[in-house]
């Protein structure tokens, strides 16, 4: 079974007019224009509308959905597919990500100040993973550049970037979500469904570190559920992780001349219901923004990279370690976020590593230790990371060293 929804070019045209008339807002986290492309997402040249499939009829090719179009030289979003970004995102081996959402005509996303926004039936969220191209040292590995993403926009220039995969989350008629991974073909013109996941040999080049070869992992359905079953009371289904008000309350450079707060943009597009304005909207820090406090940056990073499992309804709830935004930094029960907390199951390297966080002692804190290692027994997050996020680890270390809570006994 599949459903066709009409193109929504009139909504985007109206939004573009509104964008041009509005005062530009400075982009959070250094978006500063679009290096990946420009302009309002174009209509698919074939005139094909976005097509939503149910879980039993998912197509083998990404192009069948008409979310994106690639001619091998440039990837663009179809009409009605809206790009977005997050203040602080999940680290995925330095991959860049073009996030986008689609809402059926006449439907709206329910605004919430806490938790994932409420997407209507027939909605889709897609995330394309890609890297800046680079010259590696081994023909068996694709060379890609090590960098932290700053580019935004509505398209990807494939002369400068290499597509790896696109993940699609679709809200089904029964209200549940289905996740599907598509791996981009060698010619970069389409992507193929890989239900069982896949491995892509990559070599990170430059960025202040030694070249690093690794197997980039495209998740299978079971792996997807490990993270996306968060906040569902025991994994009774999966949910999107990123699209929360506090993550999306930031500016986005839709093209070189148009930058606007994303929540306001969705509201202007008539895609958001119940929105009360950015003055009352929660906001996460950008972990890279050194004008923010270390605590705000650390809370945002742990919330985006750890809390999908380390929350009361997540897969790591049994650990007793809660790393969600509301919990980290509280002084009433700091053990909940790891302070002087011994691990329940993780054996670890032994002394002097005793606690998740030892205030003022990042070098012996297990939280940072696990973020600095990639061995299966040690790595955290347990899914989606094969290399270390050196810059973020340094920030987390600085935060732990800044803590002035009582020393652990």
Say what each PLM segment does.
Residues 22-51, 409:
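Bacterial Sec-dependent N-terminal signal peptides
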Residues 87-92, 96-300:
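Extended surface/linker regions that mediate inter-domain or inter-protein docking
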Residues 34, 230-233, 312-315, 346:
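Secreted/processed peptides and extracellular or luminal domains of membrane proteins
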Residues 37-100:
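N-terminal pre-domain segments of enzymes
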Residues 250-299, 308-314, 320-409:
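Electron-transfer interface patches adjacent to heme c in soluble/periplasmic c-type cytochromes
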Residues 2-17:
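Bacterial N-terminal signal peptides that target proteins for export
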Residues 223, 305, 379:
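The −1 position to Zn-ligating cysteines in a subset of zinc-ribbon hairpins
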């Amino acid at each position: 079974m599949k459903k066709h929804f009409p193109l929504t070019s009139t909504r985007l045209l109206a939004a573009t007019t509104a964008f041009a008339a509005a005062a530009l807002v400075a982009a959070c986290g250094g978006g500063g224009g679009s290096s990946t492309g420009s302009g309002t997402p174009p209509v698919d040249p074939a005139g094909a509308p976005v097509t939503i499939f149910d879980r039993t009829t998912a197509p083998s090719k990404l192009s069948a959905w008409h979310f994106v179009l690639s001619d091998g030289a440039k990837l663009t979003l179809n009409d009605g597919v809206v790009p977005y970004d997050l203040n602080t995102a999940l680290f995925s081996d330095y991959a860049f990500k073009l996030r986008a959402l689609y809402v059926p005509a006449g439907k709206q996303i329910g605004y919430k100040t806490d938790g994932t926004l409420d997407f209507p039936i027939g909605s889709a969220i897609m995330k394309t993973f890609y890297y800046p191209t680079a010259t590696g040292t081994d023909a068996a590995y694709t060379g890609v550049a090590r960098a932290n993403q700053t580019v935004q926009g509505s398209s990807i220039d494939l002369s400068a970037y290499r597509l790896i995969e696109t993940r699609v989350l679709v809200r089904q008629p029964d209200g549940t979500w289905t996740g599907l991974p598509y791996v981009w073909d060698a010619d970069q013109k389409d992507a193929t469904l890989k239900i069982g996941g896949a491995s892509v040999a990559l070599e990170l080049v430059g960025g202040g570190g030694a070249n690093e070869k690794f197997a980039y992992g495209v998740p299978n359905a079971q792996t997807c559920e490990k993270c996306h079953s968060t906040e569902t009371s025991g994994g009774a289904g999966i949910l999107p992780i990123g699209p929360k008000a506090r993550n999306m309350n930031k500016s986005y450079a839709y093209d070189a001349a148009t930058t606007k707060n994303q929540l306001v943009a969705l509201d202007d597009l008539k895609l958001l219901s119940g929105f009360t304005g950015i003055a009352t909207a929660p906001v996460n820090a950008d972990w890279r923004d050194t004008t923010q406090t270390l605590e705000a940056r650390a809370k945002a990073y742990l919330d985006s990279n750890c809390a999908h499992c380390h929350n009361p309804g997540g897969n790591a709830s049994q650990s007793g370690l809660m790393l969600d935004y509301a919990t980290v930094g509280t002084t009433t029960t700091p053990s909940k976020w790891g302070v002087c907390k011994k691990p329940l199951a993780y054996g670890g390297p032994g002394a002097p590593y005793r606690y998740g966080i030892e205030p003022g002692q990042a070098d012996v804190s297990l939280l940072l230790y696990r973020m600095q290692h990639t061995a299966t027994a040690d790595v955290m997050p347990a899914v989606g990371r094969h290399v270390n996020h050196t810059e973020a680890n340094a920030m987390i270390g600085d935060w732990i060293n800044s803590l002035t809570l009582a020393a652990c006994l």
